[in-house]
């Protein structure tokens, strides 16, 4: 399932979802009503977005992957709240920020576990990929844990594209821009892992993403 700038409440029960956010400012609410593991992924472009995820029953499992390209003239803001209100739930969130130019990036995420819940777990991983000489990065992870017998963890990575991989690809005949594009294309491809989507539509989104990257890398 795919939607664009859909601010209405999303109820996840039996279908994984990809959403495209572009030139949007507002809030998205997601309610977990699933018993089988699901995935929510989103490409977040030029957007000031707040996402609230709430469990609606015990036993819900969700994998979230958010890809956020950031450019100089459009500072990005992303604020995610993971509210685990029931026992035996699991939410794993990964935020990848691709900083394409001398840009400002602000991403914050909160894991909140209510009193009394048991055997729930949540992890937050924030990755910042620096594709420019100077960047302004502000990540604000918050763990609000009010219960025992649960698991919560946070991790962060800041890195540049792998120079050894770039050199290897160039040794195989690619020029520097082609090698860079090949490495970067792996990030939007991860959006569609576990998502039912037509190959043509997936390739179009990846192509548009790479065009966006080229325009802001020039």
Role assignments for model-derived ranges:
Residues 183-189:
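Small/polar glycine-rich anion-binding or flexible loop at a beta-alpha turn
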Residues 1-167, 171-172, 190, 196-218:
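Conserved beta-strand/loop scaffold segments within soluble protein domains that form the structured core
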């Amino acid at each position: 399932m795919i939607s664009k700038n859909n601010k209405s409440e999303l109820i996840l029960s039996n279908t994984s979802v990809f959403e495209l956010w572009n030139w949007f400012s507002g809030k998205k609410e997601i309610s977990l009503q699933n018993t089988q593991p699901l995935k929510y992924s989103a490409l977040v472009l030029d957007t000031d977005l707040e996402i609230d995820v709430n469990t609606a029953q015990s036993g819900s499992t969700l994998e979230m992957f958010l890809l956020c390209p950031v450019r100089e003239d459009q500072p990005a803001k992303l604020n995610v709240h993971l509210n685990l209100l029931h026992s035996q739930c699991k939410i794993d969130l990964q935020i990848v920020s691709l900083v394409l130019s001398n840009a400002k990036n602000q991403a914050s995420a909160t894991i909140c576990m209510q009193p009394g819940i048991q055997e729930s777990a949540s992890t937050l991983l924030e990755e910042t990929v620096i594709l420019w000489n100077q960047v302004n990065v502000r990540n604000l992870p918050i763990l609000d844990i009010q219960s025992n017998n649960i698991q919560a963890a946070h991790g962060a990575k800041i890195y540049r594209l792998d120079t050894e991989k770039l050199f290897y690809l160039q040794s195989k005949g690619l020029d520097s821009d082609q090698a860079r594009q090949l490495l970067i294309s792996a990030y939007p491809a991860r959006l569609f892992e576990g998502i039912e989507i037509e190959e043509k539509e997936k390739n179009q989104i990846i192509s548009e993403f790479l065009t966006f990257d080229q325009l802001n890398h020039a």
